[in-house]
Structure formats: C-alpha cells, structure tokens
UniProtKB/Swiss-Prot annotation:
It catalyses: uridine + ATP = UMP + ADP + H(+); cytidine + ATP = CMP + ADP + H(+). GO terms for cellular component: cytoplasm. It comes from Listeria welshimeri serovar 6b (strain ATCC 35897 / DSM 20650 / CCUG 15529 / CIP 8149 / NCTC 11857 / SLCC 5334 / V8). Signal peptide: none annotated. ATP binds at G12, G13, S14, G15, S16, G17, K18, T19. The keyword Mitochondrion does not apply. The keyword Nucleotide-binding applies. SUPFAM superfamilies: P-loop containing nucleoside triphosphate hydrolases. The gene is udk. One of its GO terms (molecular function) is uridine kinase activity. InterPro entries: P-loop_NTPase, PRK/URK, Uridine_kinase, Uridine_kinase-like. One of its GO terms (biological process) is CTP salvage. It is found in: Cytoplasm. This is Uridine kinase.
Length: 209
C-alpha cells in the first residue's frame, strides 16, 4: 500500500451515540476499506481473578483498560501491520482465549469512552470526535443496551450508573471534550455535523499519499 491510513477517534459518554456516528462514517466510506476498533475489547484480561472480584472493578476508570496494548495495536495498524485484537466476554467480564486477526485498512475508526484520555493515543489520531448527548438520554440507552445485549438486570445497571458511570463520566470523560477537533451534539441524529466530519476525512484521505 502506498497511502498512509487515517485514524478517526470517536468518543463520548456511555450511550451518547458513538456507535451511530461510527456507522454513519462507515456507510459514507463504503467504497473504502474501513476497520472499526472498540476500546472496550481492550479491558484488562481478568481470568486470574474470581467472577465476584470482576464485578467490583470500575470499568469506567482509565486503569480498567490495557491502554498500552491498544496503543501498540493502533500504531501497528498505522504501519500496515496485522494485529491480534482481543475478544471480550461481557457476561464473564474478561477476555476470551481467542483473538481476532485484523488486517490494516485505509480508514481506522477507534471508538470508546476514554480514547482521548491518554496523550499517546490522541497523538495517533488524525481526527478526534466527541459525541455530546444529554445525560438522561445516555442513561436510557445504556440501560436498554446492557439488559438486551449484555445480560444485565435493571437493578444492576441502575446501581452501576449512579455509583460509577455518572461520577466517572464527570471526572474523566467529560473533561476530554477539550481535546476533540469536532464536537457532535445529539450523536447520529446530527447529520450536518456528520457531513462536515466526513468531508474533513475525505480531505485528509486525499493528502495521505
């Protein structure tokens, strides 16, 4: 390959609409080769601790992530090297033994709540996007998602949101908004902002030769 890949970081609070924005990017660049990397598959491997102890981990804290591994993988993809991406089991709160082989692509989208927290990771991104959505809407989306897709009970989701998710958002996630190049209010529903963002990505793609 002769072109340098472009890395787009998409962040925001849990339930903000990051996935919708990411899908909009993928749909727009359907003619290009695109790879989406989710930060939450880079939670630390916890096979060495009990399930009960895994439930006590604060998964909205920067230390919950194996950021060094994520950084090394994004850097490798930028060099057009293949990576072995972790596969995370959300019901067991740890990684699976299997890995997913990922080939480099022309556009790499990195999505996650804390991808702008570490400067080393920010420095690997060409465009940094923060999806800004009302707290109540984010909570409802998280509640529905965790119950449907991750086997959680309503009580456990509510308790985690009030005791961990909300305070961690205020302490760690919201402050990273200042590092964003683009702030998108209302997530995937903001078509004007998404159009502006995709235009910028196209401009960078043309220069990455």
């Amino acid at each position: 390959m002769t072109k340098k890949p472009i890395v787009v970081g998409v962040t925001g609070g849990s339930g903000s609409g990051k996935t919708s924005v990411t899908k909009a990017i993928c749909d727009h660049f359907s003619g290009h080769s695109i790879l989406m990397i989710a930060q939450d598959v880079y939670y630390h491997d916890q096979t060495d601790i009990s399930f009960e102890d895994r439930l006590k981990v604060n998964y909205d804290h920067p230390l919950a992530f194996d950021t060094d591994l994520l950084i090394s993988h994004i850097a490798a993809l930028r060099r057009y090297e293949t990576i072995e991406k972790p596969i995370y089991d959300y019901e067991k709160y740890t990684r699976k033994q299997e890995v997913e082989i990922q080939e480099p692509r022309e556009v790499i989208i990195l999505e996650g709540i804390l991808i702008l927290e570490d400067k080393r990771l920010r420095d690997l991104m060409d465009i940094k996007v923060y999806v800004d959505t009302d707290d109540d809407i984010r909570f409802i989306r998280r509640l529905l998602r965790d119950m449907k897709e991750r086997g959680r009970t309503m009580d456990s989701v509510i308790d985690q949101y009030l005791s961990v998710v909300k305070p961690m958002h205020n302490e760690f996630i919201e402050p990273t908004k200042k590092f964003a190049d683009i702030i998108i209010p209302e997530g995937g529903e903001n078509h004007v902002a998404i159009d502006l963002m995709t235009t910028k990505i196209e401009s960078i793609l043309q220069k990455h030769v």
